[in-house]
């Protein structure tokens, strides 16, 4: 009977210790988030919470047009000439370098 009381006391002391540790860590986290830091400390210790976009050096008029006007279709030979498909050969089968 003495062993069961010792086990019960040990379990309750462990749970009490864990509860106190959890409360302490919660308070520590809460206080660290609410206390304002100086500029030097905030940049060296943690990432900033609020991110601000910098002004662009490129004017907005030079951005890419996502919906360009319809262009005339090029023939297959002009596309081959443009990308040089006739100039190189693509081997088929497994990669000979890795074998």
Curated annotation (Swiss-Prot):
Keywords: Developmental protein, Differentiation, Glycoprotein, Hydroxylation, Secreted, Signal. It comes from Arabidopsis thaliana (Mouse-ear cress). This is CLAVATA3/ESR (CLE)-related protein 41. The gene is CLE41. The keyword Signal applies. Residues 80-89 have a biased composition (Basic and acidic residues). Glycans are attached at residue 94. It comes from the Eukaryota. One of its GO terms (cellular component) is apoplast. Residues 1-34 form the signal peptide. InterPro entries: CLE41/42/44.
């Amino acid at each position: 009977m003495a062993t069961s009381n010792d086990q019960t006391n040990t379990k309750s002391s462990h749970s009490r210790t864990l509860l106190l540790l959890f409360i302490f860590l919660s308070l520590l986290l809460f206080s660290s988030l609410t206390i304002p830091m100086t500029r030097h400390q905030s940049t060296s210790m943690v990432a900033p919470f609020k991110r601000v976009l910098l002004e662009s050096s490129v004017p907005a008029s030079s951005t890419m047009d996502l919906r360009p006007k319809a262009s005339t279709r090029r023939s297959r030979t002009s596309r081959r000439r443009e990308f040089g498909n006739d100039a190189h050969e693509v081997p088929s089968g497994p990669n000979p370098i890795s074998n």
